[in-house]
């Protein structure tokens, strides 16, 4: 629980108040996806979500995916398939993929592309698809 201006973007509460820096700042207008978190099961861009919109909701960040020192299946697939290059956008992509797979454990390529719309300057989109499909087939 934090006391601040209700219009403060959730991203800044996560990074500055909670000290969780896995959620990245990219564009600040909700387009790039580096700031993606999961709110009540939905992938959401935290830079354009006011903190007032998440009252009494479950907010998950990349840090919450690891359980008891073990990475989630999608995080492990990202490593196994050597997805990241610079890595800046990857936490947001993992969060978008996690939200998708929770709702749709066997998504089509079209559903995957519609759900993971994050921008990657390094162009790792094919590796992202391979990692997600590896989790789907496991």
Model-predicted segments: where are they?
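Signature of N-terminal electron-transfer/Fe-S-associated modules in redox systems
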Residues: 1-138
